[in-house]
Amino acid sequence: MPAATTHVEMAKEVYALSAYLQSHITDKQMFYLGSQGPDLLFFNRASILPGSTKKYGNLMHVAKVKEVIHYFEDYSKNDPLLRSYFLGYLCHYCLDSIAHPLIYGVAHALHTEGGPSEGEIHVTLESAIDLHILKKKGRNASSYNVYEDLRQDPKNVAKLAKMYRNMFHAIFDISLTQKHLERAIKDVAFFTKVLKPQQTKYKIFYAIENTCLKGSHAITGMMLQGEKNYCVLNTEHTAYT
């Protein structure tokens, strides 16, 4: 993927394209949340704690993608709120389809050259893209506030969780509780705020990673702080496999 900020900023640019499109997006907050696609499930319980919905987000990225899109399209057709979410969801896959091949290629190449795990490099690359996007908007890391665009009214959370619960049952034959999915949706705004750049917080998380996560720095890699020297923008047009 790219990460949360890049997906939301793309959604904002899509929204600005035409009045016709805006007439079909009646709730911008739901549209922006939709732009997170299945990544919505990655934030639950910080991704690494027991019971996280991360594995279901991974599943949605690799299995029955078309079926899920068709399910959400049909489910949301008479509900303007969920339709706004669905249109944002489409934006997610548009951006992923462009960015994923490059991110995976660069991550694999850097790992092969002796870098950390591909997963750690992947999220660090994504945060580098986020930082680049903010700079293009005349902003910097300290202005990071994507969590404000991802907050939801409790009624909206309940409605979206119900759609996901029904989808998992219908498409994957997986039973998830309404409560679990509502918590996962709320965790998106909560944990993207936890990732807000701050030097002391960065150092604390970095030390925790060294102590408890065997030196894997995937969490701090998601923060728009620290060294971001990976050439993910590929301005030299290097070929990756």
Residue spans for each PLM region:
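N-terminal leader/auxiliary helical segments
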Residues: 1-87, 93-241
